[in-house]
Amino acid sequence: VKDQPLDGEFCVFDTETTGLDPGVEYLTEIGAVIVRNGEVVEEFDTFVKPGKPITPKITELTGITNEMVADAPGEKEALEAFLRFADGRILVAHNAHAFDIRFLKAAAKRSGISFEPTYIDTLTMAQAMYPGLHNYKQGTINKHLELPSYEAHRACEDSAALGRIFCVMLSDLAEKEVTTVEGINTGLGGNREVLKKKYFHLIILVKNQMGLKNLYKIVSEAHVNYFFKKPRVPR
């Protein structure tokens, strides 16, 4: 899988839920698109009947009401339909590691479905590829890439928009001569463990032109390979 070329097929998806904790909250919608050769070619969307009522606050955020999911497939049926659509492709989501994948895993566990996906998180990709943005929300990246605006907080719209974003990212990766899934890690990421360590502010003074050149290299490395909320330099 790691050797998969980036001109292959990916399943780009998004989820809506009843809350933030996958241990006690449930899926309400799964939206997805298939990206093939850098283009969105198929779409999928399903509401999910959750195991608890949707609160007014969540309805205000997502636009999904209890009436909309009343006759929707249950969690197991919806997840199985999504996995058939994904058909073993590498999954792609924004903030996948912290949110979407956790919810899918929780749903799979409750449903007795084996689910150990290979996935790409476009949040960490964007941090490495587009340093200096004021935040890395999907909408911010969409605007940075000058793509059409969309209705956020609905899985069908968010997944289609992320599919377009991912296509641009693939094109940008090709320009960096990153051509495989593994290359995303080796070519962009540096050591992610470095990013979790405590950091200190540093002032660097240079004595001459050579020092200035080396400083530029350090700054570049900090932004491209070790950017996490702030540019960092490992000791």
Question: Where in this protein do the model-derived segments appear?
Answer:
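Conserved non-catalytic scaffold segment of RNase H-like nuclease domains
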Residues: 1-117, 131-153
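Phosphodiester-processing cores and adjacent nucleic acid-binding clamps
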Residues: 11, 92, 97, 102-235
